[in-house]
Amino acid sequence: MTSVSLGMPAAPPPVLAPRRKTRQIKVGSVGVGSDSPISLQSMTTTPTTDINATLQQIAELTASGCDIVRVACPSADDAEALPIIAKKSQIPVIADIHFQPKYVFAAIEAGCAAVRVNPGNIRKFDDQIKEIAQAAKDHGTSIRIGVNAGSLDPRLMEKYGKATPEALVESAVWEASLFEEHDFHDFKISVKHNDPVVMVRAYELLAERGAWPLHLGVTEAGPAFQGTIKSATAFGALLSKGIGDTIRVSLSAPPVEEIKVGNQILQSLNLRPRKLEIVSCPSCGRAQVDVYTLAEEVTAGLEGMEIPLRVAVMGCVVNGPGEAREADLGVASGNGKGQIFVKGEVIKTVPESQIVETLIEEAMRIAEEYEEMGGEDGQGGIKGSPVVSVS
């Protein structure tokens, strides 16, 4: 397409800030920090003592794209379950430890890839950091120093009055210094708060204090809709500045939903290869079809598709043809029928009742061609087509 000059300087393409340089640690086989891809985490909701249920949930998370999984370990019975879970999990397992340092040692001995400790409720056992650091070194286990506004050290609450960004960072830096005193550096840090504004500022301050890998999270983010908004807002603000090495979306929802949201956040920022994307309009008085239903049915029909496919579902003749032409596959609807576009070309016109069926059939055909070719760009992707559009 020939560009048209309007006498204005061309804006550079949008890019994120350079990735913050950090140390790299390993959580099992997954690198965190430095040039490693930003990894995606979740946490099981099953009782850890129910080994089969926990492994089943881990398998579901793995299939959804989870890189690292955390399991709770509040009791001796949970600690006894860790060796089997750590051995049979397809992805690295982190044991989540509070109050009881003895479970830190148990998790390390069990073969967990990492252990999360909370300075807010384990700090009174700081005299055991030397032994924890040595055990972790001996077993190749990394540590997450996980500061949380809801369990901040009482001494810092008294000093600051509440869980301020400065309080969260002070807690994290103090604990980090103890591990570093014993020449242990294989740790990452999180400073979580339920307020995205406070959380973002805390991570900004922490990023200025050292080259530690950072685990991003908005704690207690809430139900699926609210938690998604909070996490997307906070992660977008930080990741666009190059801050963040691994993320966990916290939702009051099944863990697989956390992975779906996290994947979309990373894909939207081009921090993970884009897969299926559906672009749809919000609908208006011009729409001549039920855009909402079309978008939902197309999304459901293509769920699980792994190729980078852009599908456009458009509801009127204003933006419809243009959006459909820009997609790999699309429909511009109106007057009880839909024009089906593939790579910008109209290939057929179908009745409204056949739009969803036709789009799904064409998407499957494109997917088969993609698999046969190994990706049009030779690297598993369709050139210039990461999205599905519904308008």
UniProtKB/Swiss-Prot annotation:
Keywords for this protein:
4Fe-4S, Iron, Iron-sulfur, Isoprene biosynthesis, Metal-binding, Oxidoreductase
Ranges for the region named Disordered are: 372-391
**Which Cys residues form disulphide pairs?**
none
Coiled-coil spans in chain: none
Under Gene3D superfamilies, the record lists: Dihydropteroate synthase-like, Sulfite Reductase Hemoprotein, domain 1
UniProt: [4Fe-4S] cluster binding residues: C281, C284, C316, E323
**How the cofactor binds, per note?**
Binds 1 [4Fe-4S] cluster.
Q: Which family does it belong to?
A: Belongs to the IspG family.
Return the protein name.
Answer: 4-hydroxy-3-methylbut-2-en-1-yl diphosphate synthase (flavodoxin)
**Gene name of this polypeptide:** ispG
